[in-house]
């Protein structure tokens, strides 16, 4: 038969084991949380090679006239004197003067074989080939 003192000692050992296990679990959770935040931070904020752009979000929908509307968010790292633009239907760095003066077709935004025309209000451009027309409006 165990003495009351042994039962107290066994309970304190058991309690200390549980406390130690809880401490180890807490440390592991903190380490895992910190490492996942570190990885997420790098995934969302990685560096882009200078002079290039990448698409970070794409949105696509149809309006009530059954015309498809697309928009995208682009992240660029351009050289001095350059800004985000479009070349051959892809995001790119272009000379800032093209955008400032709204000479959109000077950045060659259309695909090979398409004709570029600046919109009458200078808010963007259209690329056409045959009866197909793609219109791009610039927003900031």
Swiss-Prot record:
In which tissues or organs does this protein occur?
Expressed in brain. Expressed in LPS-stimulated monocytes and macrophages, especially in polarized M1.
Q: In Gene Ontology terms, what is one molecular function of this protein? A: receptor ligand activity
Q: Where is the signal peptide?
A: 1-35
Query: Where is it localised?
Result: Secreted
Predominant localisation class: secreted
Which UniProt keywords are given for this protein, alphabetically ordered?
Secreted, Signal
BP terms from Gene Ontology: macrophage chemotaxis; phagocytosis; regulation of membrane potential; regulation of sensory perception of pain; regulation of signaling receptor activity; superoxide anion generation
Its cellular-component GO annotations read:
extracellular space; glutamatergic synapse; synaptic vesicle membrane
Give the family this protein belongs to, as stated in its UniProt record: Belongs to the TAFA family.
User: What job does the chain carry out?
Assistant: Modulates injury-induced and chemical pain hypersensitivity. Ligand of FPR1, can chemoattract macrophages, promote phagocytosis and increase ROS release.
Identification of the protein by name:
Chemokine-like protein TAFA-4
Name the gene for this chain: TAFA4
